[in-house]
Amino acid sequence: MSYIEKKDKVVYDAIQKEFQRQNSNIELIASENFVSQAVMEAQGSVLTNKYAEGYPGRRYYGGCEHVDVTESIAIERAKALFGAEHVNVQPHSGSQANMAVYLVALEMGDTVLGMNLSHGGHLTHGATVNFSGKFYHFVEYGVDQENELINYDEVRRLAIEHQPKLIVAGASAYSRTIDFKKFKEIADEVGAKLMVDMAHIAGLVAAGLHPNPVEYADFVTTTTHKTLRGPRGGMILCKEEYKKDIDKTIFPGIQGGPLEHVIAAKAVAFGEALNDDFKDYQNQVIKNAQALAQTLIEEGFRVVSGGTDNHLVAVDVKGSINMTGKLAEETLDKVGITCNKNTIPFDKEKPFVTSGVRLGTPAATTRGFDESAFVEVAKIISLALNNYDNDTKLNEAKERVHALTSKYPLYN
């Protein structure tokens, strides 16, 4: 960082302040995590200088012999992690990975079955403001109003009624185990292909703590950050029969040169995920989420679906204490807890207001937080939200946050 400080003090100061924010706050945004210093070093390496259009052994530029090595390592490690027949590590993001699959599997205007955004889906699963909802005809499935679990009978009914060409499983705010086998059975029944977006749960899948969609899906997409704890980026895993179409759709279809410094960082992260301690970490992520959920319930909050099976806890703050998700997010930010407002199933509030917040445990677990720490986190959340207009109580909450972050420093 000394070079940035000398060359561009304004940018240096902003980076330092962001580090201070990350170190002093408890990060509960479910899609965020902290990469290792090895991953960060790879991403900041000289590979950022190299252009390498094409794929290992088939490049349109010279001098690619070393980036061929790092990209090939990333591919082979991803195959080992997930048991995939083919892997493309070049997508710059999860959204671009999803776009590539749609371009391979669909024609403009084709019918797709995807999860309702407010029920836990993702923008790229058919939201009308997103390219997916503009280019394709998405039919939405959701959760049962009583138990807030995916209603597989509804999924089957909608699939039979609408005859989609593709069914999309996976979510960005669903806290329960997804039955990919059931989705595959429904897809086969109506002659549809199955795509699974496992961006949020990829780390849990890699550790064997969530069913692996690769066994069932034609296409699996993911980000490489979140629970996988790698650099920000995307990846596609598919059956060998789709290899050629997927690869040519990524390049030259929707991308030019791959980000080889990011791909090297992906390789390092995948190597870390192959180690035994990665499973221990993912086990702790789940234990922490369950401790967080249970303590919030004991504090009087309604947790969507009554609990969690993964890294994520969705909380109905509107139904619990008559507070919007927006105000809850702002209040928690004041005391040093970072989360995001989020719609919950059957939400009546606007998307920028919401009735809920989404909480996740991966980042704080990386810092070393255990169940007892997350019991304390839940109690701090309760203290802050129930006293959002009481400065004395908010200061107490802030001090308790500081005690935790001091105990578990980031990049010690």
Swiss-Prot record:
(6S)-5,6,7,8-tetrahydrofolate binds at residues 117, 121-123. Keywords: Amino-acid biosynthesis, Cytoplasm, One-carbon metabolism, Pyridoxal phosphate, Transferase. It catalyses: (6R)-5,10-methylene-5,6,7,8-tetrahydrofolate + glycine + H2O = (6S)-5,6,7,8-tetrahydrofolate + L-serine. Pathway: One-carbon metabolism; tetrahydrofolate interconversion; Amino-acid biosynthesis; glycine biosynthesis; glycine from L-serine: step 1/1. The keyword Zinc does not apply. It is an enzyme of class 2 (transferase). GO terms for cellular component: cytosol. The modification N6-(pyridoxal phosphate)lysine is found at residue 226. The keyword Transferase applies. It is found in: Cytoplasm. The record marks 225 as: Plays an important role in substrate specificity. Its main location: cytoplasm. Its cofactor is pyridoxal 5'-phosphate. GO terms for molecular function: glycine hydroxymethyltransferase activity; pyridoxal phosphate binding. Its EC number is 2.1.2.1. Catalyzes the reversible interconversion of serine and glycine with tetrahydrofolate (THF) serving as the one-carbon carrier. This reaction serves as the major source of one-carbon groups required for the biosynthesis of purines, thymidylate, methionine, and other important biomolecules. Also exhibits THF-independent aldolase activity toward beta-hydroxyamino acids, producing glycine and aldehydes, via a retro-aldol mechanism. Homodimer. This is Serine hydroxymethyltransferase. It comes from Staphylococcus epidermidis (strain ATCC 35984 / DSM 28319 / BCRC 17069 / CCUG 31568 / BM 3577 / RP62A). The gene is glyA.
